[in-house]
Design a protein with these regions (language model features):
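Amphipathic alpha-helical and helix-coil boundary elements used as assembly
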Residues: 1-233
Length: 233
């Protein structure tokens, strides 16, 4: 994507879109971890409070000229006040997907004779994730029993998904800000990115998507996993 004509807008529910301007943003996104979008905005509205931002839906749009290139949708989970220079107020926002809310609650409960799709649907619905995409290519039989013991709903879900060989990500719409949580058990559920070229020039850029920076990293990780079942009555 060329830097020429590139601009960014942020729409926050309940706040007039033209009253804010995106100063900078950073998006941290990985498989099987809820993303975090940090946005620094400037506004001529000096009297905005935390209640005007928190829990409100927000959409960051990346534009190339007058054409939207990408949307990132979520809700505002954190807000802090920045500098007031007399004519603009700065606000720093943290935006996360609805799944992130599942990490705010801990619970003790037992699920019996339910498969991973049913258990996931229950917890996701409780977290406010109304729509999600179970992209399952393999059978996932019902479990005799499954215990959530003092874990957060998010910790419990991610543990179960890891045990079932599942990973998750946010699938963004290309034609609009529609965005859904996708839970997948095979790379066949991923959209191919095609071939990406390498272009270290971030000032001029090119007309297509490319990699501008990469790093090599190595670390020690577990090489095997042992599991053990216990009798439940």
């Amino acid at each position: 994507m060329s830097a020429e004509g590139l601009r960014f807008t942020l729409k926050v529910e309940g706040i007039q879109e033209m009253s804010t301007a995106v100063v900078s943003f950073s998006l941290h996104q990985k498989y099987s971890i809820p993303f975090t979008l940090e946005v620094d905005i400037a506004s001529g509205l000096f009297d905005l409070t935390a209640e005007d931002f928190l829990e409100k839906n927000a959409v960051l749009t990346v534009w190339q000229g007058d054409t939207p290139q990408r949307y990132v949708s979520g809700f505002v989970s954190e807000v802090s006040l920045g500098v007031n220079n007399g004519w603009q107020m700065r606000y720093q926002l943290s935006i996360r997907p609805p799944l992130w809310r599942a990490g705010l609650r801990q619970n003790f409960r037992i699920f019996q004779q339910q498969d991973i799709r049913t258990i996931s649907a229950t917890l996701l619905n409780e977290a406010g994730v109304a729509e999600w995409m179970p992209l399952f290519y393999e059978a996932h039989p019902a479990r005799e029993f499954c215990v959530q013991y003092g874990e957060s709903d998010l910790g419990f879900l991610t543990r179960l998904w890891a045990e079932e060989g599942l990973f998750f990500f946010e699938r963004c719409g290309k034609a609009g800000p529609e965005q859904k949580l996708a839970v997948c058990d095979d790379v066949a559920g991923l959209t191919s990115a095609g071939t990406l070229g390498f272009n270290p020039d971030t000032t001029g850029g090119g007309t297509t998507e490319h990699i501008s920076d990469f790093r090599y990293r190595a670390e020690v990780r577990p090489s095997s996993v042992d599991t053990q079942d216990y009798t439940f009555k």
